[in-house]
Amino acid sequence: MTKIVRSKYKASRRLGVSLWGDSKDAFNIRNYRPGQHGQNTMIKTSDYGLHLKAKQRLKCHYGRVTEKQFRNIFELAQKMKGNTGENFIGLLESRLDTVVYRMNIAPTIFAARQLVSHGHIKLNGKKADIASIRLKEGDVVEVKESIKQIALIQESILKQGQTTPNYLSFDVPSLTGKYLRVPNLSDVPYPFEAEVHLVIELYSR
C-alpha cells in the first residue's frame, strides 16, 4: 500500500493537480511536475495534450481503473439516453469501490478497492467482492462486523466530519450507507476541475 501511496502522489504532480485533495499530497508542497524541467511554465501543451491530461486526471482519480475499463464505461454512457458526460460520471460514481470511498469508509480510493476485493463489504446484506459492481438506487452498503474495529476503518471514521455527497447517506455508528440516486457532475466532490467534456471529445474522435 505504501508503494501505491507514493506513486499516486507522483501522479498528482505529473498531472498538475491534487487528485484526491489529500493534505499529504506532495503537489501541495511542490505544485509542478517532477523532473529537471518541472518548473518550466513556458512549455506549451497541444490541444490533444489538454484532452489527454483531462482524461488521465479523471481516470487516476478513480484509482486502479484500467484504460480498457474506462473506455468501456464511456461507450456504455454513450449508448444511454441523455447527456453522455453526465451518464459517464453517473456510471463511475455508481461503482462499489467509489461508493465505499465517498462514504468515507476508507481513507483512499485504493483502500476502498482493497476492502471490497478482500470481501469486507456487504451489499444488500450479502458479501460483495467485485469493485466494479454498479449500484442501483436504494442499495445498502455495509462494513462486515468482523472488521469494524480495524485501524483503516477507524482512521476513516475520524474523517467523518467531511460531508457525505448528497446522493449517498451514511450512518457512522452502524457503518452502513445507502446509494440514494445517480449523481450529476455538479454533485461529485472532485478536488480539481473535472473537465469531462474534454474526455468525451477525446473518446469521440
From Swiss-Prot:
Taxonomic superkingdom: Bacteria
Pfam families from the UniProt entry: Ribosomal_S4, S4
Single GO molecular function: rRNA binding
Record keywords: Ribonucleoprotein, Ribosomal protein, RNA-binding, rRNA-binding
GO BP: ribosomal small subunit biogenesis; translation
Gene Ontology cellular component list: small ribosomal subunit
Ribosomal protein is among the record's keywords: yes
InterPro entries found in the cross-reference section: Ribosomal_uS4, Ribosomal_uS4_bac-type, Ribosomal_uS4_CS, Ribosomal_uS4_N, S4_RNA-bd, S4_RNA-bd_sf
S4 RNA-binding domain residues: 94-157
RNA-binding among keywords: yes
PANTHER family (alphabetical): 30S 40S RIBOSOMAL PROTEIN (PTHR11831), SMALL RIBOSOMAL SUBUNIT PROTEIN US4M (PTHR11831:SF4)
Record's function text: One of the primary rRNA binding proteins, it binds directly to 16S rRNA where it nucleates assembly of the body of the 30S subunit.
Entry's family note: Belongs to the universal ribosomal protein uS4 family.
Subunit note: Part of the 30S ribosomal subunit. Contacts protein S5. The interaction surface between S4 and S5 is involved in control of translational fidelity.
Protein name: Small ribosomal subunit protein uS4
